[in-house]
Swiss-Prot record:
Propeptide, chain numbering: 32-42
PROSITE patterns to which the protein is assigned, alphabetical: PA2_ASP (PS00119), PA2_HIS (PS00118)
Protein name: Group 10 secretory phospholipase A2
Cellular compartments annotated: Secreted; Lysosome; Cytoplasmic vesicle, Secretory vesicle, Acrosome
Length: 165
């Protein structure tokens, strides 16, 4: 395979604004269909479902945002969205300390009129985890999106993080 054509980087630069716009468009759960009752069983991807149910943006917009949105997290949260993700990390840590498995535990929830309704819960872990995801969905829905924190370089995030409540 030979070297990349010179025009390829230019094409990527031209496409970048369109790709960023896609990240900010409403998610699949934000239209008329979200007003219909939907019942979900959670896997790791259902966190995205709760965020998509409540929020104005696709959940993908939060995958690599700031210092805390996405896998792992450390440092000082950069804005309100990052604080939502920090709070969610803390909530999952409390759930793990209670013996729950946040990334694999399943629970029932409903999306009704862009609101997450938890339950019915079969145990305390299901109740805790649904509340964690419900809280971040509601938190993110009230924030302003700052493109400068999308794909934020992790090396700019400090090693120490704020303590959880």
């Amino acid at each position: 395979m030979g070297p990349l054509p010179v025009c390829l980087p230019i094409m990527l630069l031209l496409l970048l604004p369109s790709l960023l716009l896609l990240l900010l468009l409403p998610g699949p759960g934000s239209g008329e269909a979200s007003r219909i009752l939907r019942v979900h069983r959670r896997g790791i991807l259902e966190l995205a479902g709760t965020v998509g149910c409540v929020g104005p943006r696709t959940p993908i917009a939060y995958m690599k945002y700031g210092c805390f949105c996405g896998l792992g997290g450390h440092g000082q949260p950069r804005d309100a969205i990052d604080w939502c993700c920090h709070g969610h990390d803390c909530c999952y840590t409390r759930a793990e300390e209670a013996g729950c498995s946040p990334k694999t535990e399943r629970y029932s929830w409903q999306c009704v009129n862009q609101s997450v309704l938890c339950g019915p819960a079969e145990n305390k872990c299901q109740e805790l985890l649904c509340k964690c995801d419900q809280e971040i969905a509601n938190c993110l829905a009230q924030t302003e999106y700052n493109l400068k924190y999308l794909f934020y370089p992790q090396f700019l995030c400090e090693p120490d993080s704020p303590k959880c409540d």
